[in-house]
Amino acid sequence: MTGRDSLSDGRTSSRALVPGGSPRGSRPRGFAITDLLGLEAELPAPAGPGQGSGCEGPAVAPCPGPGLDGSSLARGALPLGLGLLCGFGTQPPAAARAPCLLLADVPFLPPRGPEPAAPLAPSRPPPALGRQKRSDSVSTSDEDSQSEDRNDLKASPTLGKRKKRRHRTVFTAHQLEELEKAFSEAHYPDVYAREMLAVKTELPEDRIQVWFQNRRAKWRKREKRWGGSSVMAEYGLYGAMVRHCIPLPDSVLNSAEGGLLGSCAPWLLGMHKKSMGMIRKPGSEDKLAGLWGSDHFKEGSSQSESGSQRGSDKVSPENGLEDVAIDLSSSARQETKKVHPGAGAQGGSNSTALEGPQPGKVGAT
């Protein structure tokens, strides 16, 4: 075989390898990577670069003529990457006579597909994304600063409210004297006693209640310091009795027959007697004021009235105090009327019976 035959064979084989330039009578190509690129399974060894003046070799892309543009040929026929390497259309004719770049010299592409010509650096985000991230970061920082300012504004009023103290009541000497006097009589005054103190001292009732609470705490602290454990026990029992309306135990009442000193709870018994005395005084006044009438002040009372009055004088003062402590109800009044069935028609016997403890009326008779 001569050199011309080998050259013609090489040109026909190169035309067969170029995609899009298939010879007549060849089998249809598939869609595989090797078929699309025009690569055969067995390629001959590349020939030397100095064998001819034209484009030679089994896998050489045809050099474009002087009137054709290499970039357009590379875009239409050659795969990606080969057209960029073989763009010689703009070169002078002397350079076009040089041997073209052989396909065998180019490294084969991987079967998974052509590699990108210029991969971008993944670390560099696009400028639009970078600006968006910066704006997001700026907005988040602004929102954080605004939220912190709001929290500071919310915290400052709370601190101001915490620092603000309640107005303390300043008691005068007269007010303290009245309060101490009431405390010596009863450590647990009821609402009526507190209202009376409020009228006397010109203080609100809730301030008086708070003063009594503080005074009781001070008293308990002093008794603990002095070692009065029994007094503290009596004091706690007395407070429970007043708060829950519990009567005085029978054991304490029975032990009081020999006097306060012989009692098992002298302090509790003394406080109980003081409180009972305060209850009896307004009760007796109300009872006498309700039962007094115009008949008590008339001159020339009848003999029946004087006899009933003498009978009432014989009643002991203890029984009189017990009658005063009884609840003033209609049933109690009816019972007192039944005790004296032979009284006058206007009920003068009942009224004169209650006048026994009064010294002025007794002297008049």
UniProtKB/Swiss-Prot annotation:
DNA-binding region, residue range(s): 164-223
Keyword Zinc: no
Transcription regulation is among the record's keywords: yes
Predominant subcellular localization, coarse grouping: nucleus
Keywords linked to the UniProt accession: Corneal dystrophy, Developmental protein, Disease variant, DNA-binding, Homeobox, Nucleus, Sensory transduction, Transcription, Transcription regulation, Vision
Signal sequence range: none
Result after altering residue 166 to W: In KTCN1; sporadic
Stored Gene3D superfamilies: Homeodomain-like (1.10.10.60)
Domain CVC: 224-277
Gene Ontology terms: biological process: neuron development; neuron maturation; regulation of DNA-templated transcription; retinal bipolar neuron differentiation; visual perception
Effect of residue 247 to R: In KTCN1; uncertain significance; also in a patient with retinal dysfunction
Tissue: In the adult eye, expressed in lens, iris, ciliary body, choroid, optical nerve head and, most strongly, in retina, but not expressed in sclera and cornea. According to PubMed:11978762, expressed in adult retina but not in lens and cornea. Within adult retina, found exclusively in the inner nuclear layer. Isoform 1, isoform 2, isoform 3 and isoform 4 expressed in adult retina, but not in brain, heart, kidney, liver, lung, pancreas, placenta and skeletal muscle. Not expressed in thymus and spleen. Expressed in embryonic craniofacial tissue. Expressed in fetal (week 14) retina.
Gene Ontology annotations for the cellular component aspect, listed alphabetically: chromatin; nucleus
Motif Nuclear localization signal per UniProt: ranges: 161-166
Superkingdom of origin: Eukaryota
Region of interest (Disordered), ranges: 1-37, 113-167, 290-365
Motif (Octapeptide motif): 31-38
SUPFAM superfamilies recorded: Homeodomain-like
Cellular compartment(s): Nucleus
Similarity field: Belongs to the paired homeobox family.
Linked pathology: Keratoconus 1: Frequent corneal dystrophy with an incidence that varies from 50 to 230 per 100'000. The cornea assumes a conical shape as a result of a progressive non-inflammatory thinning of the corneal stroma. Keratoconus is most often an isolated sporadic condition with cases of autosomal dominant and autosomal recessive transmission.
Name of the protein this chain belongs to: Visual system homeobox 1
Organism from which the protein derives: Homo sapiens (Human)
Lineage, highest ranks first: Eukaryota, Metazoa, Chordata, Craniata, Vertebrata
